[in-house]
Amino acid sequence: MTLLGSAAVAMWWDISPATKAEFENWHSHEHFPERMRIPGFRRGSRWADLAGGEGFFVLYELDSYDILASPAYLARLNDPTPWSTQMMPHHRNMVRSQCRISESFGGGIGQYMLTLRVSPVPGKEEALHREIRSRLAALPEIPGLTGAHLLKTETPKLVETTEQRIRGGDAVADWIVLLSGYDADVLDQIGREALAAALVAAGAREAPQAATYRLSYSLAATDLAA
């Protein structure tokens, strides 16, 4: 998949089996449409843990970085709906990263997504970025893969929002590598093995934290009726 715009919000969290059905209903029919009606939001996608675990990965693609601090977005973050207020406490082990899209290669939306959370060794940022860019550029041409991207977290300097207070505080990832494709085995082989080892050799602080997901739902702003 080609990422839309130049900024993104990348999130990971766990949902218990007892809450999953209501969560997916709320997230698909209220929360995603609400977010996609915010000016500058281009597309949202929700990905479920491939192994059937409790984890979800959610990605919002935005026109530009300044959308993260826009009055329209902050208004929603500080005035959640009653259903959102009910569901937010069920987001366990929340990681929420507000990012600039640094590199994006490929096209289309694959069925699977592998996420790698990476932190550079201080002083190795440029070397690590060069290695990531070089490797990601070639990956979408490999059978089984369709997209490869690098996001870098840059958190806006804002006061804590109402949604964050409801969840009890969010952790933050650093750099995020996303690989998408239609063959989960190829995705894992390249992402968890070859790419992960290359990143450590190029200046990643430790082995990237990897997880693989299957597409659950996607909604673009253009999908909504005017």
For the regions a language model picked out, list residue spans one by one.
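Macromolecular interaction modules
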Residues: 1-226
